[in-house]
Amino acid sequence: DMYVPFICGGPRVGVFQEMIQVLNAKHTIGGRTCETFGKTGSDGKNHWWMPGSYAEVIYQLLEKEENITLMCAAPVVGVKLKTSGNRNQVTGVRIMRNGDYQDIDAAVTIDATGNGLIADMAGCEYMFGSEAKSDYNEPVGIEVADGKVQPCTWMLISERIKRNAILPIDKLKGSSAVEDNLNRWVKADDKEDMIRRDAGIYLHWGRTVYCKDTREPLLLAQAQQEALERLQENLEIWHEAGYAVHLAPKLGVREVRRIKGEYVLTANDLIAGTMHDDVIAHAHYSFDVWGMKIPEEMKHIGPYGIPYRSILPTKTEGLLTAGRIISATRIAHSSLRVQPICSNIGMAAGTAAAMSALNQTGLRSIDIKQLQDRLASMGLFDGLKKK
């Protein structure tokens, strides 16, 4: 719903690899399977698909899972808690269903919201905004914490609707374009080649704006309105050129809460390529902190591991986190927040939750080696195997 149907980062393994394989086989923008895509789409080209294609493939994958029940239009509005000493025990959630509250009991709950709201409602400690470098002895970052999160971007897709219309890439202000199956971004100096390729449909990072507090719906609405106002000139240029513009249903938010876990992943871990003893997912992507300059020689890093402790909130039982809300500094978060890595973390969290529930074992007592073996059997560690 934020229109980021574009893959970056890795490794692309497990269910994420399965998804993009189907996307490449049946849903390419050009209508033909990309022959260089390989198993992971790591062919040096940009690949993207229509957001609806993502939804279609995900629903098809869900249909194969007999033990998954999907419920739509039923937001979580509360968390069921038991208190024991200095710990909270999460025993399920409360949802709003057709205007009434309904409680759902669960041996384990996973917060995969992307904003950490469930963990927040459970009373978990969380981090928000920029830390100072000295807070975690990181070599990159800012000297004094300012509490700012990364800016938000309103994504969009432009599509030709008039015969022979040409994307006015040289007139659009602050907007390059992503053409599917191309090894570079489309910019003004590429216009002649762009006309020759004649794609006719492009993905754009529309307008980027700051939101003071991405936890607050009113401030998000104001940021979205600002982004729309800043888009107006380009929207008119697109329309005059014979292009329709499909705006994402809502503003794209990069960063909200980061739930503090038993271990806080830092830039040092990523730079060193640390693989902790309790690693449950691999990750590989550069530091990508929008709104902050990171020296080029430090920006690009190698593979690293996500430890189980980073998805285990402190002082809380019965709850795991998944995706971009896990326990990490803002700098580390800027790398792990992308789709393949979030998917890998999600698979690990789901597997750990199933082990805990089936064995009636606390999340802090599960056999980590057994968890790792199960994840390995699902191919989750295949991305870093030696060729």
How would you describe each model-predicted region?
Residues 1-80, 127, 150-156:
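Conserved N-terminal/central alpha/beta ligand/cofactor-binding core
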